[in-house]
Amino acid sequence: MTPQDYIGHHLNNLQLDLRTFSLVDPHNHTATFWTLNIDSMFFSVVLGLLFLAMFRSVAKKATSGVPGKFQTFIEMIIGFVHGSVKDMYHGKSKVIAPLALTVFVWVFLMNLMDLLPIDLLPYIGEHIFGLPALRVVPSADVNITLSMALGVFILIIFYSIKMKGVGGFVKELTMQPFNHWAFIPVNLILEGVSLLSKPVSLGLRLFGNMYAGELIFILIAGLLPWWSQWVLNVPWAIFHILIITLQAFIFMVLTIVYLSMASEEH
């Protein structure tokens, strides 16, 4: 396999054609609306369940005495997220903090998959399960990141209408920044673009950073001899720990900020 083939192989998703419910050939297929990236969906669900299992286990075993190391770690994460929500969200909703915690930990776990050896799970998938392709970093799939951003967008609309009413939401889109009926078309364009840019930028920012990080690991593995890969892999992996944490934090912060803006007057 040439370096070009190796890189291309690792950038292919395991895809299911929803019209025939059969796996597609990643080398002779163009993705369509009816194509589902089942590897991204699988790892997203598994990591979500892992998050729920970890926090449920800690909640059941939590004691008022001296906590264990894992409980202390989880409490630090909860305290950090709670402090962030308290500083940035000025509404009264009780679901924002749990939502922010879910977003932060879930996105972090997705990003963390990028630190696994690049050939480990694809090799297992190919030689044990006969899978034609496998990508293990859900946040490097634009479909996953934009889907999560779409969920945030729906919440933005929900909280805007809940806090301001339908009339207030429509007025915000049509009467600002120019408070005159003659400027309604201009206001609608400006506010509409501003509103739609939030989920698009939120999803593409996470995707772009994680895709680039994954691609660098693939390039190192595909272009260098195996005995010299560690020279670049180790420093990049150490630096990437910061990237995956920072991207999870940014996604959480922007989610909180957008929902806070939706809950307030313009």
Swiss-Prot record:
GO terms for molecular function: proton-transporting ATP synthase activity, rotational mechanism. Its main location: membrane. It is found in: Cell inner membrane. One of its GO terms (cellular component) is plasma membrane. One of its GO terms (biological process) is proton motive force-driven plasma membrane ATP synthesis. The chain crosses the membrane at residues 33-53, 95-115, 141-161, 206-226, 237-257. It is a multi-pass membrane protein. Keywords: ATP synthesis, Cell inner membrane, Cell membrane, CF(0), Hydrogen ion transport, Ion transport, Membrane, Transmembrane, Transmembrane helix, Transport. SUPFAM superfamilies: F1F0 ATP synthase subunit A (SSF81336). It holds the Pfam family ATP-synt_A. CDD domains: ATP-synt_Fo_a_6. HAMAP family: ATP_synth_a_bact (MF_01393). F-type ATPases have 2 components, CF(1) - the catalytic core - and CF(0) - the membrane proton channel. CF(1) has five subunits: alpha(3), beta(3), gamma(1), delta(1), epsilon(1). CF(0) has three main subunits: a(1), b(2) and c(9-12). The alpha and beta chains form an alternating ring which encloses part of the gamma chain. CF(1) is attached to CF(0) by a central stalk formed by the gamma and epsilon chains, while a peripheral stalk is formed by the delta and b chains. Key component of the proton channel; it plays a direct role in the translocation of protons across the membrane. Belongs to the ATPase A chain family. This is ATP synthase subunit a. It comes from Klebsiella pneumoniae subsp. pneumoniae (strain ATCC 700721 / MGH 78578). The gene is atpB.
